[in-house]
Amino acid sequence: MKLLNSISSLGFGVVASMMLTSCASVEAPSPVGPLPSEHQVEWHKMEKYAFVHFGLNTFADKEWGYGDTPASELNPTNLDCEQWVRVAKEAGMQGFIITAKHHDGFCLWPTELTEYCIRNSPYKDGKGDIVGELQAACKKHGLKFGVYLSPWDRNAANYGTPEYLEYYHKQ
């Protein structure tokens, strides 16, 4: 019986030692490869964004634009960019991205770099700026704002040339 008690005490001591040493803190391993920047980590925390595609195809009833729809077809009535942003915020979105220029080449802001833009549409008598209106609404309602600008431009005759790259960067 005395031997059994000694073995039990020894077993308890071994188990207790193992438990205590397994609770010791260990340093994390060094990272391997590139680490995300603080800005990139913050971007990943933004889980929900509205991505809105609105442009000439909305009014031409087309799924795919070729850059040949006249700017005069963009004529939204009662467009309320603040309403879009409010709905996005109510839906839990943290930001709003507008397709400012899709592959058809039409620009939703009054750029001087191309005639194929909102200033040549009847919207607000050519003085409209949907990109600017959305940006202001996002700022007012506390949403982040972004634009999608397609690198492909079916309306630009110089697409695919070094001159086009310069034009694209100026946009």
Each predicted region: which residue ranges?
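Bacterial N-terminal signal peptides that target proteins for export
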Residues: 1-11
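C-terminal motif of bacterial Sec signal peptides marking the signal peptidase cleavage site
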Residues: 21-22
